């Protein structure tokens, strides 16, 4: 299957099971922060097996960046991507995505669901427009937090972490529930950005609407 061929310039692990890829950028390639792309590995037998990944770099950058959660138990594309290194190639297919910035609000990310928000925050930070935005980032444990130092530097006190399986002193150690939302959100008449596992997103949609948020204010991947 056809696609734009890009070469891997650098790889590194940012957590135990999350790998960062820096890629060449095709001339004229465009995306909006928060959008992603269907990606396949440029190898015989792998080119037709596409998976969706989100770009985390600034659109103006000279290279592309993907941050990928590796699922070895799935024995699929991410397991193969774990073995890729500098000089290997990927194919970029259709650009897509409905998670784009609409205005200040709350961002709720679960695990690797942080990736579309990274590009958005980086762009807002560059433009000096991060004020009024809060990130609530849920992970199983402290070791699963992706790009923690950068997020802390950009958002400071507006970066809130929750952990579902590991109690960490000074941080919430439970799943995000209605009580959490009532404590954190004083105004439900604003934008709410949601990204993570389907159950995580679905539960937040339901709870936010029940607490007074307009369905039209919820931004998520349909």
Indicate where each model-derived feature is located.
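Ferredoxin-reductase
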Residues: 2-86, 139-141, 164
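FNR/FR-type flavoprotein reductase catalytic core
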Residues: 73-222
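Absolute protein N-terminus
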Residues: 1-2, 222
């Amino acid at each position: 299957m056809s696609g734009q061929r890009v070469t891997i310039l650098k790889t590194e692990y940012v957590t135990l099971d999350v790998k960062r890829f820096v890629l060449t950028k095709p001339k004229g390639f465009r995306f909006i922060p928060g959008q992603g792309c269907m990606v396949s590995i440029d190898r015989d037998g792998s080119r037709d097996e596409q998976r969706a990944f989100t770009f985390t770099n600034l659109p103006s950058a000279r290279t592309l960046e993907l941050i990928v959660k590796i699922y070895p138990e799935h024995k699929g594309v991410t397991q193969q991507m774990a073995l890729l290194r500098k000089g290997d190639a990927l194919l970029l297919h259709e650009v897509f995505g409905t998670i784009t910035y609409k205005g200040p609000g709350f961002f709720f990310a679960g695990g690797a669901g942080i990736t579309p928000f990274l590009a958005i925050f980086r762009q807002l930070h560059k433009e000096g427009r991060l004020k009024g935005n809060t990130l609530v980032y849920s992970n199983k444990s402290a070791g699963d937090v992706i790009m923690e130092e950068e997020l802390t530097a950009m958002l400071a006190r507006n970066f809130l972490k929750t952990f579902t399986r590991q109690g960490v002193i000074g941080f919430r150690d439970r799943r995000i529930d209605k009580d959490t939302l009532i404590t954190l959100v004083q105004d439900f008449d604003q934008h709410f950005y949601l990204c993570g596992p389907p159950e995580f997103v679905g539960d937040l949609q339901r709870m936010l609407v029940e607490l007074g948020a307009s369905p039209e204010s919820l931004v998520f991947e349909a």
